[in-house]
Amino acid sequence: MTRMVQCAKLGKEAEGLDFPPLPGELGKRIYESISKEAWQAWLKQQTMLINENRLNMADPRARQYLMKQTEKFFFGEGADTAQGYVPPSA
């Protein structure tokens, strides 16, 4: 049976994640209140941040930056956006 959550990002009930996507308290919080749809949106955003900012994921500072952006994306005022990015129009 599909696990449903009240998604904090999307503001609606949606299919929940199958397992915590990150270790620690943040991973638990995301698992309990973020949907698969919202997690996929974060993965796209994260990829843009890594590429546009040329983050080296072997650098602890880059990983710390992404963890802060993850928390801001789901539970804060929103993550940083890539410089000059214009979302495609529908």
Swiss-Prot record:
One example GO MF annotation: iron ion binding
Record field: transmembrane: none
Keywords in alphabetical order: Iron
S-S pairs: none
Keyword hit for Protein biosynthesis: no
Gene Ontology CC terms, in alphabetical order: cytosol
One GO process term, biological-process aspect: cellular response to oxidative stress
Family: Belongs to the Fe(2+)-trafficking protein family.
NCBIfam families to which the protein is assigned, alphabetical: PRK05408.1 (NF003817)
Role noted for this protein: Could be a mediator in iron transactions between iron acquisition and iron-requiring processes, such as synthesis and/or repair of Fe-S clusters in biosynthetic enzymes.
Protein name, UniProt field: Probable Fe(2+)-trafficking protein
Species for this entry: Paraburkholderia xenovorans (strain LB400)
